[in-house]
Amino acid sequence: MAKEIHHPDRAQIDLSAVLEALSEPTRRDIVLRLVEEGEAACMAFDECGPKTNLSYHFARLREAGVTRVRLEGPYRKISLRTEDLAARFPGLLEAIVAAARAADKSPGGKAPVLAAD
């Protein structure tokens, strides 16, 4: 019998948990790839780091309500919960993705810091 994978219900998705999950660069990279490519097998992210580290990052994203993991035979498929996130926090995922892409294009790979007036 397959182990059931727990996901928070839409109403249980917490803004602080989502922001904390997306504050880590590896998890942001996973989300950016899912935005670009759609659902993927967890093993498709092997170049992002060791399997134990990736398992931890996948769990943090799932527990925060950012992703959904489903079993397909021996594989785990991961996808973004775009509809749930948009319903709870309209525009949040799009803003985070846009900021992450802008950061990737800036010198040093970090988001530009605006000078205070």
Question: Residues of each region from the PLM?
Answer:
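Short beta-strand "wing" residues that participate in macromolecule-binding interfaces
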Residues: 68-69
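Amphipathic alpha-helical dimerization/coiled-coil segments
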Residues: 2-14, 36, 81-117
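Glycine-centered, phosphate/nucleic-acid-interacting loop/turn motifs that mediate DNA/RNA or nucleotide
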Residues: 65
